Every structure is written in structure tokens, then in C-alpha cells.
């Protein structure tokens, strides 16, 4: 395609990419990222796909997500909530944080069925519905990343400042922290919404998710800053671990809690990185003069790419229960006891016990003993 001609459209309604070349005031970084993301750029696989082919690929990926990941996320997060609440008297501080994280994940997983089959991006053309869905998703996205950030900081206090901060690391303060995190998540969403809504009330196709200031805030407050804090916490934790091994060693319980939280943070980073890179590339592109707000939406500009990064982000909420089940020793013990209590028939009890023992190989006799060593 000649560099002086505008990007071609594929199909009837889907706009595949911005006009190229970009305006003269664009930065080299924005130009390179724009070309890299273009769905009709050389080397980009989606550039040669028709509208129907992109729809089929998106539908196939949505079906894979619904068949394999959605049941794990939906049932797994419910189990985390039900089992831990059933044994609330034996709940540790990390368990309390994971319960709140599971609540946020469960809401995201339930909402994901609407998102993953929104293949034509139709509800993004309805201003009220688009704004409502965006508010709903952002609150739970912020709560997830805020809980992960606070859990990393809590691990640092438990390992490096145990003597100094022991009086403050109580269940009462943990519950108070959870309430403040939920309030911060709601505020981080509603305050910008109120501000931008007053400026865009006259726009027929206004959607909260498409406002550039909101997108910058989402990338900065929901990804860059939290992971900078998490990285700092884990660097300090590593230093504390090295010192602990030199002197007296580290309690196995705390090692396992640290390993589980690190795994959750790593999976969150991998799943949400594509979404934030996608939004950042869109933000670095200069708005074309005369473009309507609807056409500026990156969801309309790159439908297949946007659908893929959405699926990756939702996958995080489905994978957390797996991490919690396989790395959370206390939860495995609680799950065994919960199943044994709820299965009254002897044959069914033996079957469930054997199944759990095969899936989670660990001796059940040690379950009650391990409950006593709370973090």
C-alpha cells in the first residue's frame, strides 16, 4: 500500500486502522507503535483477514474461554468464598485478603460472559450501556490490583518488620484495610467519571471507557504504579529472606504464603500486560482531525486485537483459584474437611475423599494440625 494513501476499510462497518502517515506532529515512538499495531500493516496477521474471518476467530476464542476457563473461575472463586467463610474462625490474614480478591474475581468472571460474546462490539455504540459496563469493570479491576499491591506490602511487613509491625497486623486491621481498598476502588472510578461526564454530556456517543484521560488513569493507577510498588516490596522481601536464611531460617508457612502471593502477582502481570500495552499504544497515537469520538475508540479500530487482550485479562480471574488451590496448603485442608462435612453418605464421602486425595496429594490427618499455625 502506498504510504500516501489512507488505510483501507474491510467489510462494511469495521474501521481497521488510523490514517497513515500520521500527522507531522506525531512522535517517532507513536508512529512505530501505530504501524506495529495496525491490523493492515505488513507482517500483522490480522491485516489479511476479512471481517467474517475475524468474527470466526473471535467466536472460537470465546468458546474456548467459556468451555475451559469460565467454569474454573466461576466455581473456583465460589469455593474459595464458601469454604473460607465456613471456617472463618481459622481464617488467617492472607486468607482474608484472598477472600476479597476472590469476590472481585467472581464479579469479573460473571461479567466476562457478556464481554467475550460481544463480538461485534455492539454495546459500545450504546452510550449508557458502554459507560455502565466500563464502570463495573474498572471498579473490580482496581480492587484486584489494589488487593494484590496491599498483599505484597503485607508480606513485606510480615517477613521484614515482624517484630515492629506485629501489633498492627491483626484481623481487625486487615478487615479495615479491605474496606478502605474497596472504597479506593470505587473512588478511583466514580470521581473521574463524574468529572468527565460533565464535559461530555452533549456527545451522543460518549462512553466513559473511551475518554483519553480515563485511559491514562487506568494504565497509570491500575498497572504502572501498583507494579512499581509490588516490585519494590518483593525486592525488599528478597533482601529480608537472604538475611533470615543467614541467621535463623524462615518459617515454612511464611515461605508458602509468599510463594502463593508471588504466583498470583505474576499471573496478574502476564494477563493484564497485553490490555495495558494495547491501551497505551492507542493513547500514543495522535487523534485525527475531524474524527468523531466513536471512530476514535480503539475497540472499533482494532476489534480482533481488542477482543484477544480482553480474553487475556479475564483469564486472570479464572486462574487465581487454581493458584490458591494448588499453592494454598491451608485452603486444601479446609476444602477436604468441608467436603467431608457436607457429604453425609459414607460411599459418597469415600469417593470425594479419594478424589481430593488424588487431585491434591497430601495427608488429611495433618489438616487440623496445620490450622493452628496461622500467618
UniProtKB/Swiss-Prot annotation:
Topology relative to the lipid bilayer, per the entry, is: Multi-pass membrane protein
Which coarse location class applies to the principal site listed for this UniProt protein?
A: nucleus
Its keywords, alphabetically, are: Acetylation, Apoptosis, Cell cycle, Cell membrane, Cell projection, Cytoplasm, Cytoplasmic vesicle, Cytoskeleton, Differentiation, Disulfide bond, Endoplasmic reticulum, Endosome, G-protein coupled receptor, Glycoprotein, Golgi apparatus, Immunity, Inflammatory response, Innate immunity, Membrane, Mitochondrion, Neurogenesis, Nucleus, Postsynaptic cell membrane, Receptor, Synapse, Transducer, Transmembrane, Transmembrane helix, Ubl conjugation
Q: In which tissues is it expressed?
A: Expressed in brain, heart, spleen, preadipocytes, mature adipocytes and primary hippocampal neurons. Expressed in neurons of the hippocampus, hypothalamic paraventricular nucleus (PVH), supraoptic nucleus (SON) and the median eminence. Expressed in the nucleus ambiguous (at protein level). Expressed in brain, pituitary gland, adrenal medulla, renal pelvis, ovary, endothelial cells, visceral fat tissues and islets of Langerhans.
Matching entries from InterPro entries are given as: GPCR_Rhodpsn, GPCR_Rhodpsn_7TM, GPER1-like
Which compartment or compartments is the protein found in?
Answer: Nucleus; Cytoplasm; Cytoplasm, Perinuclear region; Cytoplasm, Cytoskeleton
Which residues span the membrane?
63-84, 97-120, 133-153, 176-194, 221-236, 260-280, 307-327
The record places the following residue ranges in the Cytoplasmic compartment, namely: 85-96, 154-175, 237-259, 328-375
Q: How is it modified after translation?
A: Ubiquitinated; ubiquitination occurs at the plasma membrane and leads to proteasome-mediated degradation.
Q: List the disulfide bonds.
A: 130-207
Glycan-carrying positions = 32, 44
Q: What happens when the gene is disrupted?
A: Strong variations in phenotypes, probably depending on the distinct targeting strategies, genetic background and experimental conditions used in the different experiments. According to PubMed:18063692, mice are viable and fertile and do not display any gross physical, immunological, reproductive and neurological abnormalities, but show 17-beta-estradiol (E2)-induced alleviated thymic atrophy. According to PubMed:20734455, male mice display increased body size, femur length, bone mass and cell proliferative activity within the growth plate.
Name what induces it.
Up-regulated during adipogenesis.
Any single Pfam family the record assigns to this protein: 7tm_1
Name positions with the PTM N-acetylmethionine: 1
| Self-association state and partner proteins as the record states | Interacts with RAMP3; the interaction confers proper subcellular localization and function in cardioprotection. Interacts with KRT7 and KRT8. Interacts with EGFR; the interaction increases after agonist-induced stimulation in cancer-associated fibroblasts (CAF). Interacts with EGFR and ESR1. Interacts (via C-terminus tail motif) with DLG4 (via N-terminus tandem pair of PDZ domains); the interaction is direct and induces the increase of GPER1 protein levels residing at the plasma membrane surface in a estradiol-independent manner. Homodimer.
Family recorded in the similarity comment: Belongs to the G-protein coupled receptor 1 family.
**What's its job?**
G-protein coupled estrogen receptor that binds to 17-beta-estradiol (E2) with high affinity, leading to rapid and transient activation of numerous intracellular signaling pathways. Stimulates cAMP production, calcium mobilization and tyrosine kinase Src inducing the release of heparin-bound epidermal growth factor (HB-EGF) and subsequent transactivation of the epidermal growth factor receptor (EGFR), activating downstream signaling pathways such as PI3K/Akt and ERK/MAPK.
Tell me what this protein is called.
Answer: G-protein coupled estrogen receptor 1
Q: Which organism is it from?
A: Mus musculus
